[in-house]
A protein has these predicted regions:
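Repeated loop/turn-to-beta-strand initiation elements of outer-membrane beta-barrel proteins
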Residues: 95-98, 151-153, 198-202, 234-238
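Detector for outer-membrane/organellar transmembrane beta-barrel domains
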Residues: 154-156, 163-164, 175-211
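Hydrophobic, lipid-facing positions within transmembrane beta-strands of outer-membrane proteins
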Residues: 42, 82-86, 137-141, 155, ...
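Residues on the lipid-exposed face of transmembrane beta-strands in outer-membrane beta-barrel proteins
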Residues: 46, 86-92, 141-145, 159-163, ...
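Cleavable N-terminal export/targeting peptides
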Residues: 1-38
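Short glycine/proline- and aromatic-enriched beta-strand/turn motifs that initiate or cap beta-hairpins
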Residues: 26-105, 264-273
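Extracellular/periplasm-exposed beta-strand and loop segments of Gram-negative cell-envelope proteins
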Residues: 54-82, 104-137, 163-183, 211-217, ...
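Short, loop-centered acidic/histidine patches that primarily coordinate divalent metals
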Residues: 207, 231-233, 241-245
Length: 273
């Protein structure tokens, strides 16, 4: 009797498993693209970013004189030497993802500034060459919750922490000055992924935080990107888009203040698994 019941249980389990699994298996065979894309576990991308830089850098007083540099007019920086951005998107189930970003972008410029001063009642005109360098490094780790997770569209909220380092150096015949700013920051925002057709995808993301004033820290940050992705084969593709990044920070009254805006186009490659 026990053996008979054992076989009945086994047969019943097999029938139940087929009844549950068969529709899912059939759906996977009929539409593998939608099923697989909804559950991408890993997305990796590497992009090259080039564009302009605008803004001001307040280095404070140097030898009793305030030094405020306009990065375009005074420093002669109108375009970047280029930079790179690495991004990783790791899935943990249908609605939970973890995002990691690291980027480095360098700018350099050269300009000749006309200076008119009066010494002993006599006007003196001088031309001062200025060589400058600005380096931005950024890292960010975030949690992404998708409150809409469908094969054709994903919409989510992003929350995390980031870190950036900005170094500005100016070298002239009258002297040199360097300003550095390193700080962690909170990051909040959202993202949107649309799959309009086949291997083509559209992605938009905005992160940052509004104006805050906490103890000796004040500032705000915004990081926005929009891009298109096309997968040549199922797991490898290319992408191109536009990124806009602006920050305004000061840690202490004696530290340099940065009001900078990066923008420009980027292109690169992406893999998904």
């Amino acid at each position: 009797m026990g053996g008979r019941y054992r076989w009945l249980i086994i047969v019943g389990a097999v029938v139940a498993l087929q009844w549950v699994a068969a529709p899912a298996a059939a759906q996977w065979i009929v539409s593998p693209e939608g099923q697989q894309r909804q559950f991408d576990r890993v997305r990796l991308s590497a992009t090259y970013w080039k564009g302009g830089l605008e803004g001001r850098i307040d280095l404070g007083d140097i030898e009793g004189l305030p030094v405020i540099l306009d990065v375009r007019d005074m420093l002669g920086i109108t375009a970047s030497e280029g930079g790179y951005i690495f991004e990783a998107n790791l899935g943990a189930g249908r609605r939970h993802r973890f995002l990691f970003l690291y980027g480095d972008r360098k700018h350099s410029g050269f300009n000749v500034v006309d200076i008119d001063v009066t010494v002993g009642g006599a006007p003196i005109h001088a031309e001062v060459p200025i060589a400058s360098n600005i380096d931005l490094r950024q890292a960010r780790f975030s949690y992404n919750f998708l409150f809409v997770a469908r094969p054709e569209v994903e919409i989510g909220l992003i929350g995390g922490v980031g870190w950036f380092e900005t170094i500005a150096s100016v070298d002239t015949s009258l002297g040199a000055a360097t300003g550095e700013l390193r700080t962690p920051y909170p990051s909040f925002g959202g993202n949107l992924l649309i799959n309009p057709a086949g291997r083509l995808r559209l992605y938009a993301e905005i992160c940052g935080f509004p104006e805050v004033n906490v103890e000796e820290f004040s500032g705000w940050l915004a990081d926005f990107q929009v891009r298109g992705e096309f997968f040549i084969i199922d797991n490898l593709g290319v992408l191109a888009g536009y990124r806009w990044y602006q920050m305004d920070f000061r840690l202490e009254e004696s530290d340099p203040a940065f009001d900078l805006k990066w923008n420009g186009f980027f292109f690169g490659a992406q893999a998904r698994f």
